[in-house]
Every structure is written in structure tokens, then in C-alpha cells.
């Protein structure tokens, strides 16, 4: 016979395998009282991860720790296998009464035969007896009574094991390790239930059941749905278990029926469940499911017990009332192990148990039930699927009569098995009950067939269980999930509520018939199918519903996969790597499918395209996937732009059968009219579009797009027919670029943008939002962004995005409406943006400005989440307007907000689809509104085309007022754009930000040559070296920061003088690059950190690039006197350059090398500044992770600067120091300065920087870090050792200094002080 896979010993499982592998079959078959009948759910382990829908009832052994408590397991409805485990009692053997011994001998003899007949393999002391399926000879009477079929997933069969009530004098049952001596008096095992069977068999020996007569016990809590996972241990805490005791006594006649034929009516197991089967009513479910019966049923239980008890007492001589049932019920509470139930409760329970049975039921039902049970049990032996009839009357057994009192009773019996106070003149001792209880416990423990490890904690201490797994013989069936067993429990007169089962598992093939006690559904496939579908639904839900309001696009190659490709702002800070061929971004299969999409144009109005013709931009081109929008259909029909055609907006100039179509855009009344009609709907959509939370997500695949998205998608689908490749978009968009980007870029539009986020708590003036819609006309949609510089504001924004409703979004020339109070339709970004410029002057609301050329690029059907310049519109709090200037060939926006008082750079990213397209970079400079008075600086052109700007801008404004664009205007814009591009070819521009010495902001921007092809221009960032330097245009306004107020210098706006910077000597080499000294043509010294990207390995280059992005992200957000200032970034060929403030003094290590160890007074001052900088980092959830002498720089004025944030990381959130949530699991840093937790990889938190500070102070004091005499690896092992003691400072240093270092080098990071605490240390007081 095939055996069930033997349960593994789980840390939290009571299913300890039987200890005696040598025990004879007789021993095995004679069940110790700890032996457990396990109702095992055979469902697949994968199904367990659904919602823990299976509630497995398991009874805990007496020995079990009360803490093993119960954990409610939701009843598994899938497939239930009843496995009977026969754990051996580990408790020391105790003497058996002569009477008991005799009974056992009888039982053993009978059981011996049975055991021999069914020789059971006892491999690891797991007895898996396959019970073949046989029809029950009799249907339990109680089950017949049951009218409302109930699905008892977890039937505690433990109660099925009969115990003789005659064993009154037996001290607590002891299951002894050596089963072979089972027959001996001293070692009487909890096989008392077997004994009871024999006793009962005395009345009807013919019904001998296997030691584990699989007596269906009512003690099965139906699903307790509220707890999908392991129930909280709160249920263990049952304050007044005593109140439940009376219920325990309610032994349901059902037990009689349920009890094996050997078991007398008295042996009826108390049903642990309320007749109504209400999971809420407190039905004690075996083990973890134990819900305590409610006291309202107390009297009924008592009465039933009294009746049953009296009857039992009468029959006790011949038929020992198996307190086994009591025991079982007790056992079920044993799971709870509440130590607060007095032993008297045990006695009460015993009495109740005997009383509960009604005499008449006892006789009639007992016999029939025994017969049924015996036959069933025997059948079980052969029938894997017949669970066992558990005809238990829920008659008044309200919620398992076994209450905590029994549980405690068991414990009390353990503690004082002799503390028997006979209740109701019962000669029964709680010891007997105890034994029975233990038997029940062991018997009723539930083994989870699939994941044994998932057993409740209570199971951990279970005695070894010989698992007679019913189904394992038909292992294929079991593996396929034996469908759940439906057990109906007829209740006498009491209404039954349908069993509550998890809805996900609700679909069952078999339904319980009133006339059938057990329904075994068909195979598991259906359930599994359900589970799979359910899981897929869950997956799709969880992954597709990430921060996306209603509609969102999931990037997938084939079927919609809920894989989201996120690229944080950090990852997009830098321009796309030049080494990356933009072509791969367009997957070939997408190109092939584009023609097909054209065929589907007619259907796009009603359905979304299955595949997007243009892949959304994912950070890694190699993993780029097409975007499959999962969008919710608009709640109400909208005209939007679905009714617009290309003929409404574009005039096809040139097209070929195979090539892309080239269109010229022009304003038409219908187009403008549509824009007007949708202006009122913008507010609704504003709430749908959300700014990236915490990070600029270049998540092209996941944009929060609203209903507009679906509409736009259809519009875009029409457009896709003309776009066979990414390049085609350029032709389409040329006019857009001319109209908008050039208008802005050539004019460097300095319009006032009011960016007050007063109510929003956002300090940064400009906001970037993923374009929520499909960027309809972005000419460079496919162009991968070249983000050269990004100012600290961006990182600030990562945490400070305003309410979505307040953001007005400028979609990338998409056919969507942008969101604004007086919003602009994204479809006419051109018109709307121009119009916004006008509104800007009126200060009604901040205008979203055309962010970058790339947003005007290829109309990607997906909004590639281009970060369009999002000017937050806050009409209520419009107190200031910052001028916004967009410079042509820059993809980045620099914004100086009054809140941050510093120049901030924004880089906008776009797809890089064509090889020649390195995106333009735009700079938006926010100026004080004061300088913008009288509209004098509405538009300013930078570049050599300043002349004529006024007239063109005036035309633009006029056209905006008329809300229509004329051919003349378009022509002017196009001519201006071309002229500007020609003049600015091969130019490298730099934005120099002059501030006070502490806040020198110098940002270098590179503009690339812009070759033209097919009337379209694509940009390549090329840094042209002139001799030893690079030409840089000073395109930035000079900001004088005084009194924390920025003063705009209008003269600087007109500065066109090129700035060169020359590379100088190497200042140092860090973990991620080499730092050079640079001199600009303005005479400023800067530090330039250059990192060469590996062109041969694209993946490695991307990884390195992301590291640099993260470093820059951090640097831009950090503004502190003790942290080096960030000036900008540049991508030159395959080298990334980061421009930083130059610290001429050098590092502390170099100072030590030059001057030797520092005096205490000196390093005390330095230490204080280091701590101040670190405290600032930690306050902003950043850990430096590489603090050492080489990374601490000294200004000539004595100011300390922390540098090299290549290892720095931002913590998940601002948690308590040392908490697991903000621990980083990677090892970075230098071994001599590494904290023990870093070396041990137990998590890197803020406190790890404190350790490094201690080592740095030690280094400043002695000239070398601690353990410098050791080899690097030896030092690592020493520091990582738990007992390794760090050396103290030499004796000649003050006690305060030594104590400071000692505190920093505290091995336990939880005891290590924080930076703020150390700043209050007495050692630093002298630094004042």
C-alpha cells in the first residue's frame, strides 16, 4: 500500500513522528491516547498560499506547550484527507489499574488481529494506512437528520477515539516511548481509546475498529473565515475558560453516532462545534480552530452531560464511557492550553461528558453509530477517500462542549492528575479524562498533507503521530487534491447555518447531501483550476493596481503580464547611454505587428489594442516590452479626440507605401473646438493623473492614465498606421517641435510660472509627472532621454508630490486633455502651452511648459511616462510666479524655487528609439515674479536668434488668443528652429550658477549636434573638445543668494559667452571613478568625478549608470554645509562626469599624512562637523555607508565636507534606528571602517555610520584606523566576530575622547548611540 509522504517534523508542528520505529504492528495499531486522527487537507501546497482557506483542526497533546496555543486554520474546502496519526505519548508510563490492563489486553488481542490483518508499515513512525473507499454500511443517524449539508473541512477525528469511562482510577495516561510493551500495566498508552473500543466491543465486539477507529467527530470547526492566516494567538487567551466548562459537558449524541462501533454511546465525542456550525459562535475546533463555545449554551451542555452521564454511569460497568470523547474535546482545548482552568473544571467536564449523553440516544444511536463507525473505520482502512462519517448531533452541543476548561483540565490533570473532585457522583477521575484527552489530542491533530510545515504552532509539540493517511494509497489522487470531504452534521432542532468557507474555494464539485455524511468531491483539478485562476487574478490585481488610478499600462511582450518595469527618477537622471543603440528599443515583433494594428483601426474605438506598436520605455532596452494598457473604460462616453482625424490636425506631406507618413500639423476650427469642449473635463482627470510618488518613475510601462488613456489609445492606433518605425514619428512631429519646442527653445521662454506649493507642502516649483496619456504627438517619443543634470528639487519632489488634483499635466502632445482648471488639451500642447503662457502672465495658474523635445517626439501609443514639465497649478495659493525659461537643446529643466533657495535641475526623459536621437535638453529657470513684472520678460530667446523674438512671440500670443495657429506662425517657428539648430550645432553649453562660496551651483549642460534628416532633427549629444577644454555657453542666470533670497539678474539671461573647462590633475580615485580638478573659463575650480562606462558590456554599463544616477539623486537633494555641493552632470561619449564643489584642503587622510595625527582639539572640531553632516543624512533617510578619512574633506577655512556618496543609499523610510525596515542588506565600505553588522550582513542602518565615525575619529587621533596592523581580511573577521573587542584610544587622550570612541564602537548597533545623541556627548562640548 502506498503511504502518505511522511510528515516532516516542523518547528511549529505537533506532528512529531512516532518515536518507536521498532514498535510492533500491534503497538502501532493500538493507538496511544496521544495518537491523533488527522483530518488532512490534501490540497496542493500551492493552494495553501491562497488564503489559508483550510482550517485544520488539530488537538494538542497534553505535553504540548500552552503557548502552542491554537491558531485558527480556515477550513480548507479543497480536498480533505483524514489521516490518523498515532503519536506515541512521550510522557512517562504510569501504572494502569488492573481493570484497565485487562481491558487493554482485550483490546490488544482484538486489535492485534486487526493490526496483523492490516500490517502497517511504520517507517519513520508514521503509519500511513490507506483507507480504501467503501460505502458506509450505514449512514449515521445524525447525518441523516442533518438537513442543511455542512462542509466540515476540519473534522476533528480525534474525538472519534473512544475512551472508557471505567478507567476512573487511571492516573494521567502515559504514552510510553517503547510501544512494544504496550500491554504492560505501567506503560499503558493512551491507546485507551482502543481499550475503550474493546470495552465497547464487549458490548459489540464484532465492531472492533482499528486502533484509530476513524470516528468522525463533530469537533471540527467549520471555516473561521475571518482568519485566513494563522489566527492570532489572542484566542489562546481565554480569560474565563471556566465559563465554558458546562458546555464541555454537552456531549452530543452525534458522538454516539460518530463514535466507532467499539465505542459505547458514552464514548460519543463531544462535538466541539456549535450545532449551528457558526464559526463565530465559538465552536471549539480541534487545535488551532478552537473557538470556545458561548456560555449561552452552558445549561444545555450541562443537561446533556448529566443525562448522558447518568446513562453512562449505568452502563459504565459494561460500557465504559469513553471520556475519550471528553478527552478529545478536552484535547481540542488542550490546543489552547490556557493554564487558567482549574482542575475542578476537568472534573466538571468529565461529569458533563458522561451526563451529556442521553440514555436513549446512547443505546440506539450508539449501537447504530458504532456499527456505522466500525464499518466506516474498517472501510477507511481501505478507503482513502471516505473520511469517516461524522454523524454528530449538534444537538445542543453548543460549540464543542469541550471548552478551555477541558483544556485546562488536561493540564490540571497533568499537574495534578489526582485532583479529581467527582462531579455529579461520578467515580470518574479527571485522570481518565486526561488520558482520554491526550488520546484525543493526539488523534485529533490535523496533519496538513501538503505543507506539513504550515501546521499551526500548536502542532509543534504534537506527539509522534502515525499518520494513517486515508488517501495516500491513492497517492495520485491525493496529490491531485482529494476533493474536500463534506460532512453534514444534523442538529436536533437547532438551525444550522451554512458552513462559512472562503469564497475563493467555495466552488466544490460535490455538495453535501442531507442523506450522506461525507461527500468527497471529484478530483482536485477543478479546485486547482480555481486556485490557479484565483492566483492569477490576485497577481494581476496586485501588480496591475500599483498606484495607478483607473487605467494603467503594463509593459508586456506577449500576454499581459503584471510585470511592472519601474525606473526611478534616479535611474533616469542621466541621459541615455550613448553606447546604447536606440534601435533595440523597438522590438522587431512590434515592428512587424504595426501593419496589423492598422487593420484594427476600426476596432480601436471600442477595444484597446492588444499590442502597442511602440514599446514603452523601460530602463533596460534589453528588457523592453510592449505596453499593454489595462485601462478602465470611460465611465461616460466622451467625444474627446476620438472623433478627430489626421485630416483635422495634419496635412500629409509625403508618404510612401513602405515608409513613414510625414504630416504637417495645422490648427483647424474643429481641433480648437474640441479642445474647448474638453476644457471643463480636465478637473476630473487631474485627479486621475498622479505625479510619481517619491521618485521620478521613468516607468514607461506604468503610467497612471485615466479614461482619457483608452480614448487616446484608439486615436493613437489610427495614427500608428503611419508609423512603421520610430523614426516616422519625427516626420509627424516636426511641426510640433517647430510650434512648441522651438518656440520655447529658441525663445528660451522666460515666462512666469507660479510654482507656489503652499498648500501642497512642496518646496519645488516645478513638478514632473508621468504623462498620463498616450503622448499623441511626441516627436521624440522614441528618443531616449539624455538627462544631464537634475537639481536637488527633483529628489525633493520624490517625497513631496502635491495632491494629484492640483497638478496640471502637459501631456506630450498627446490627444488627451491636460489637467488644469483652465486646462489645456494635451492634444494641442502647442496651443495650450502658448495659451498658458498668456495665462501665466495673468497669474491665474501655473502653466505647464513644454518640457522637452523628447516629449514632442514619436507619438508613442503609450505615454512613455515622459516627465513633462508639470507646473503645479494652485490658484488658491498663487502668491508667486517663477519665470520659466525653456532652452532649446536641453532636456533638463533648472528651477530655482524660493523654498529651496537653490537652483534645481530637472531632466526630462524620453525614449531613445532612433540611433541618431539623443534628446535635447531643456532648462527651465524659475525666476522671481518681481523680475517678471509687466510681462517684460514673457519670452526670452537664448541662442543667436534673439533678434525678432519679440515679434514672433507676439505672433504666438496672438495666435493663442485666437486659439488657432496660422501657417505663417508655423513657418516662423520652423524657420526659427532651423536657424537656431544650425547655429548651435556641436555646441556644449553650460549653466553657471553663481552663489555664495558655500553654495556654488555650476551646472554643465551639453548640447549636441542636431543633424537633420527628412526635415526632422534628431539630436546627438556630442561634446566637442576645443583644445583642452569644452565650449560651454553660460546660459544660466546668475543667482545671488543673500539672506536666503534669490535675486534674479536679468543681465545674465543674455549671456552667451561660451565657458570652457579644463581637466586638471587627479584629486583622487574612489570606488566608482576618478576625481579630477577642473578649471572653468570663468576661473572657478570645480571637482569633476568621471566614470567610464563599459561599452563592451551593455548590462554592466547600465548597472554602473544606475549607480551614478542614484549617487547624483542623493547629491542633488542634499544641501548642508558639511556635505559637498552638487553642480551638475554630463555625459560625454561613454564617460559620465559629475561636477561638484571643489574642496581644496584635501581629505582628512591626506592631512594626516602631511601633518601626522591630529591634536585632540582639532579632531574634536572635525568630529562635531562630521556628526552634523551625518545627522543631516540620517534625518533624510540616507546612510553614507563609506565614512572614512578619505571621504572627509577639509576646506581651508576648517569646514568639513563629506564626499563620495557612491555607496550611499536611501533607506526605505524613516524608521527607528536599527529597525529591520530600514536595514540595507548589502556590504559596502572599507573593511577597517566597517561595522560588525555590515560584515555579518545582518543589515546596514544608520547606526552603521556611527561605527564608521568612531573608526574615523580613531584614525584622526592615531593616524590609522583600528586594527590597521591586521590584514584587511583578518580585520574583517575580527570585527565580524561576536567577541572581537575594538582597541581603545591611547591613554594620553582624554577620558571623554576615549568614551566617545568606545560608544561609537559599541558592537550591538541597537545599543549604539545615534548621531544626534553623540552630538550631545561631553567630548564635543570642548569644540565650542
From Swiss-Prot:
Binding site for ATP: 1067-1075, 1089
EC numbers for this chain: 2.7.11.1
Gene3D superfamilies reported for this sequence: Transferase(Phosphotransferase) domain 1
InterPro entries, alphabetized: Kinase-like_dom_sf, Prot_kinase_dom, Protein_kinase_ATP_BS, Ser/Thr_kinase_AS
Keywords for the protein's UniProt record, in alphabetical order: ATP-binding, Kinase, Nucleotide-binding, Serine/threonine-protein kinase, Transferase
UniProt family annotation: Belongs to the protein kinase superfamily. STE Ser/Thr protein kinase family. STE20 subfamily.
Record's protein name: Mitogen-activated protein kinase kinase kinase 19
Source organism per UniProt: Homo sapiens
Lineage, opening ranks: Eukaryota, Metazoa, Chordata, Craniata, Vertebrata
